[in-house]
Amino acid sequence: MRQIITHFTDNDLYTFSCQYYIMQKYPRAEVEYTFIDRNKTCYPKGFDKLLQEQIDYMAGVTITDQEVEFMTEKLVWLPLWYFTFLRGYRFNPNEVDINQDEEGHLSILIRGKWFSTIMWEMPILSCISELLHTLNGDVANYNLEKEYAKAVAKSEKIFGAGLVFGDMGTRRRFTYDHQKLVLKAMKHVYDSKPWPGRFTGTSNVWFAMELGLTPLGTMSHQLISFEENVSGVFECNYNVMRKFSDVYDGNNGIYLYDCFGDSVFFNNLSKRMAMMYSGLRVDSGDEEEQTEKIIAKYKSLGINPATKQVVYSNGLDVDKCIAIHKFCNGRVLDSYGVGTHITCDIDNAKPSNIVIKLTKCRITEVREWHDCIKLSCDKGKTLGNQEKCKYILSLIG
C-alpha cells in the first residue's frame, strides 16, 4: 500500500496550537490516547498490519522549509523557536500500539510525552479511513467527475445561503485526494463571483498552503480533560481559558466549552474571559438551545452577543447549517465548521465514525496516572472511565 501521509502539515491546525500550549504549560506531562470506533467496525483481516505500515512511514515525514515559511507567515501567534522545534520533531512509531482481534475490531493505544503524542491523532484517523475505503472497494468505484459536481453544487448552496463556512474534515475524509478535490471545488465556486456567504478556509494546514486558503482552528477537548485532573471539574474551564489566553495573548479566541457540559462552563465564565475570547464553539447539544444559553450568558455579563462569534460544528450537514443560520438571525456572528458531510459524502460509501481521545494522564513522569474523561451537552454521551464519568456527573448534578 502506498504511503498515505506524505506531508508534515497534513494535519489540523489545532494540533499545533495545542502542542505549543502543552510545551508552555505542561512540558513534562505524559498521556495515553485511545482509539474509539463508534460503529464497532470489523476491519478486514490484516488491517492492523497495513495500518502499522502507515505508522512506520510517518517516521520519515518531516517539516519542509516551505511549510515553515507558510506557518510563520500565517500563524504569527506562534514564536519562531517553536518552528525550530518542529524542524527537529520526528514521529515515533514506538508510541503507537495497534492490535486487531479475531472479529476484526481495532485497538489502538498511543502513549508518551503529551507534546509528542498529540501529533498522532489526525494522521492515524485519516489513514484508517482511507485504508478502509480502499480495501472495501469504495475508492475503485469513485467517480471523480460526479463527486466534483456534487462538491460544486454543495458549495453554491452553502455560499448562496449566506453561511460563513469552513472545512474541518481531515480526520474522517474519504481520501486525501477527495479532500483536495472538495476544497478546490469550494474555492473555485467562492472565487467565481460575489456571494452572500464566506469561505473561511480549512483546518488542514497543508491544504491551506497548497490551495491558498486560511488555516482554521484553535483548541481541542483534551486540554480541558487534562486540566480537570489538575484543578477539578468546576475550575478547569476557567483555568484553561486563563492559561490559553496567557500563551496566545488573546489570539486563538474561540473556546470549545462543552467538555463537561454547559452548566459547569457558564457558571464559571467571568466577564474578563468572555471579553478576552472572541467567541465559543458549539460541538454538542441542541444548537438552538445552546445558542439561547450563549446569548443569555453574554447579556448577563453586559456584552452584546451580536459582537461575539459562535462556531457550530456538531456533525452538521448543509441543511442543518442553513436552519441554524436562520435561527441565529444576526443575534450572534454564526459560522460553521463541517467535516464528514464535506469530505466523505460519497455515494454508496459509509463514513467512518472514529475518534482518538485522551484517556489517561499524569502531570510529570514521576506522578501518578489519572483517568481523563469527556462529557458533553448531549445527555448520556460520555467518553472515558465510566465510573469517573458517573462520579463527575453526580458532582455537577
Q: Which stretches of residues belong to each language-model region?
A:
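Glycine-rich phosphate/ribose-binding loops and adjacent secondary-structure elements
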Residues: R2, L211-G397
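Ordered alpha/beta subdomains of enzyme catalytic regions
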Residues: M1-V240, S245-D246, V355-G397
